[in-house]
Amino acid sequence: MLLNPKHAYFAQKMLSDLRNEKKHMLFYLTAASTVGGMHREEYKEYFAKEASSEMQHVIEFQNALLGLGVDLTETNDAVEFNHYILSYSPIELLDYALKMESEVVANYAHRIKEDVKLLSEPDQTWMENFYEEQLVKSREDVDNLRMLLRTV
């Protein structure tokens, strides 16, 4: 399906969000293995759970892009991801996770306020709801990470 220019612009924004979700997934997978310290097992379990959650986000974004008519087999954007930090320190890993999640909360709020308006109905309402759900999940992660960082 050929996208009109406004839909194509929105699709590029979504592909950027997909790359971020892949970065999050890979970060949490790596952190589950590299995290050190006395509470390593608890952090390992936490990061592994978050990796699983991020994998679900990746699937949700890919499905939404397909629903908008984006052919994921025709774009390298669908397989690329952004880089992330490597560390053994639980504090550094949690702090980085907080920065990542805070960034996507801001991105998703912007998508809802600005970018979704580029779409026509019913895609506009669908994407507003999609991004609102993603925003809630990521904001809950931000709040949880803030609480975790208070105790380390």
Model-derived features: where do they sit?
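Short, contiguous alpha-helical
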Residues: 56, 127-152
